[in-house]
């Protein structure tokens, strides 16, 4: 059973976090000529699109190479569920060989999705460097030694609690919620 959602980030707080993340990317990657930003399907895509919009509108950076990476068949729990996973498409606008790649997701939890992304990205080339950007870092929940390079907000939550990210385009509001597990 789940408890009442607790608001962790409001729309203005999400906006500030995304703008800060965009600035950090800009500091590290300058004109992005050697960088490919890749959102993990499905939930990292909204973060990628928001960052791309900020970089385009506020910093006039056009033609940033982006991509969408599906990790469905690379997950270690792929065959463990009764219901089949629904795969999304992988779309890379530019080759990643020798480029700096920034993997983007909404919530970093156990690290298993990122491990799957690292395996999946090998199918498309060998980047010179891979970084990780996440809007929310559940820092004490890792099963694997994976740490983000860019973090919007760190959240401490119990193992069975859920952190959900809502986007205006998909859910009618920008918000991040913590939903406590009320099982005893």
Regions found by a protein language model. Give the residues of each.
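PRPP-associated nucleotide enzymes
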Residues: 1-184
